[in-house]
């Protein structure tokens, strides 16, 4: 379900240094995918694990070289980015 206004995006504190050290192409690809996710947080990506609630999501970016995991809080209209992996 797409929303007219994007959800706010918060990053786990531990990701601050990792975000600064990502290559430029990774940061650009991540920003593009998170913008899309912010407008359609549950419709984007896939469920992180079948054993976790539907709000735990996973999405690939950068032609599959990156992965971002996030939790959707519809109540607070926020996305909480918990993990980023870049193998590019």
Q: Language-model features: where?
A:
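Short linear functional motifs in flexible/disordered or boundary regions
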Residues: 27, 42, 49, 81-82
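Enriched for short, Lys/Arg-rich terminal
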Residues: 1-6, 17, 28, 32, ...
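A short, surface-exposed loop/turn module that caps and links secondary-structure elements
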Residues: 35-62
């Amino acid at each position: 379900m797409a929303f007219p206004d994007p959800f706010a995006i918060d990053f786990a504190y531990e990701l601050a240094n990792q975000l600064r050290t990502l290559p430029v192409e990774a940061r650009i690809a991540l920003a593009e995918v998170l913008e899309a996710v912010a407008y359609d947080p549950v419709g984007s990506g896939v469920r992180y694990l079948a054993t976790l609630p539907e709000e735990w999501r996973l999405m690939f970016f950068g032609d599959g070289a990156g992965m971002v995991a996030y939790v959707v809080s519809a109540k607070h209209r926020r996305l909480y980015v918990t993990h980023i992996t870049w193998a590019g």
